[in-house]
């Protein structure tokens, strides 16, 4: 993977779900709602001064959200940050940089 270029979309892994779970409360607070389902479906990653994860998450019914989560470099010892998100996404919507 080139530094700065997002990876190809991949199926979500247990690690991806763990990352999504760690920022779930940040999203629920910003949206002022609790999601009955929060299942990571797919993701892309981008190496920067740390890693950006773009994660498609199923949040119930036919509703999806796209998350951009930043993970700092290991030596910085900082928590994951929900950098940005997009709501009202569908299952077929492609993960893109936002």
Curated annotation (Swiss-Prot):
Gene3D superfamilies: 3.10.450.10. A motif (Secondary area of contact) lies at residues 46-50. Keywords: Acetylation, Cytoplasm, Nucleus, Protease inhibitor, Thiol protease inhibitor. It comes from the Eukaryota. Pfam families: Cystatin. The keyword Nuclease does not apply. Belongs to the cystatin family. Able to form dimers stabilized by noncovalent forces. This is Cystatin-B. It comes from Pan troglodytes. The gene is CSTB.
